[in-house]
């Protein structure tokens, strides 16, 4: 019975897009090679600076600056000529894995590195692929290990206990400060009790609510009225109060004698359509007809 082969392990972003990786690598190698060539020419000019013209050296410096700026732009675009700026996220998301290690000299590797690397062995892979810490970090770790081994066990225990005590005191102090801030924020009232009680009393009993009184408008000032000219009378206007006592006296005599009051055109003032008669006060009764007993029935 034959069993199927197990599927290969799935690794995230492991050469998922080999074409883009190859294109980005070629672009980066090209930019780095151009910058390296200019740097070599500048180093030769500095060795022969007495014989080298300064304008040519300044031109090389400007060319190197433009190449370095183009290299930085290519790194921001992950080596893609027409990509967007992701600041190398595409290159960091892909893993470089060593496919073969050998101690024999490799001509292709020598030609690519210009003779700096003879073979891809176990001693070079950790340094170039950064799979182990830097030598400076290793030296610091060795110094710490040496100091620890030089001290006695009792001294180390006492120092550890003192450090733990100081750290615990610092942590407790920080926790107490945080707790105090939290309690102060929780206990701080967000309302005023007096204002709340005042609002409740005003809603339930109407306490503290004042009604706004509206002031009555002032009465209009009275002005003297004049009579309009009649069709048969004079054209000049006459005041109303001129014929008022005689007219009221004749009406009063007619009412006391039992007859119907007669209105006379001579006694009635003529008013215009827009004017109304206004009397400032009631005229007194005629003193000759004060008592109704003098008239006969």
Swiss-Prot record:
Biased composition (Polar residues): 285-297
One BP term from GO: regulation of transcription by RNA polymerase II
Region (Disordered): 204-297
InterPro entries in the record: Mediatior_Med8_fun/met
Compartments it resides in: Nucleus
Molecular function terms from GO: RNA polymerase II cis-regulatory region sequence-specific DNA binding; transcription coregulator activity
GO CC annotation, single: mediator complex
Superkingdom to which the source organism belongs: Eukaryota
Main location: nucleus
Compositional bias per record (Low complexity), positions renumbered to this chain: 223-239, 248-262, 271-284
Similarity remark: Belongs to the Mediator complex subunit 8 family.
Assembly and binders: Component of the Mediator complex.
UniProt protein name: Mediator of RNA polymerase II transcription subunit 8
Organism: Caenorhabditis elegans
């Amino acid at each position: 019975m034959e069993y199927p082969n197990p599927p290969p392990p799935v690794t995230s972003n492991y050469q998922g897009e080999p074409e883009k990786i190859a294109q980005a690598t070629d672009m980066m190698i090209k930019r780095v090679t151009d910058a390296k060539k200019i740097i070599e020419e500048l180093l030769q000019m500095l060795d022969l600076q007495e014989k080298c013209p300064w304008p040519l050296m300044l031109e090389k410096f400007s060319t190197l600056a433009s190449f370095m700026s183009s290299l930085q732009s290519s790194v921001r675009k992950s080596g893609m000529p027409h990509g967007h700026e992701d600041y190398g996220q595409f290159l960091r998301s892909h893993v470089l894995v060593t496919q073969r290690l050998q101690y024999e000299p490799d001509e292709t590797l020598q030609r690519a590195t210009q003779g700096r690397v003879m073979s891809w062995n176990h001693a070079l892979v950790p340094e170039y692929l950064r799979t182990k810490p830097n030598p400076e970090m290793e030296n610091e770790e060795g110094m710490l290990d040496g100091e620890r081994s030089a001290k006695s066990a009792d001294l180390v225990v006492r120092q550890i206990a003192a450090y733990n005590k100081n750290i615990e005191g610092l942590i407790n102090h920080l926790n107490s400060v945080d707790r105090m801030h939290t309690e102060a924020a929780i206990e701080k009232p967000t309302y005023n009790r007096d204002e709340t009680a005042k609002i409740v009393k005003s809603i339930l009993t109407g306490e503290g609510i004042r009604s706004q009184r509206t002031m009555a408008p002032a009465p209009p000032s009275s002005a003297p009225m004049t009579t309009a000219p009649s069709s048969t009378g004079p054209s000049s206007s006459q005041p109303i109060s001129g014929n008022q006592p005689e007219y009221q006296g004749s009406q009063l005599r007619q009412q006391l004698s039992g007859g119907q009051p007669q209105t006379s055109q001579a006694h009635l003032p003529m008013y215009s359509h827009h004017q109304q008669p206004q009397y400032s006060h009631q005229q007194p009764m005629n003193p000759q007809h004060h008592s109704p007993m003098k008239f006969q029935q």
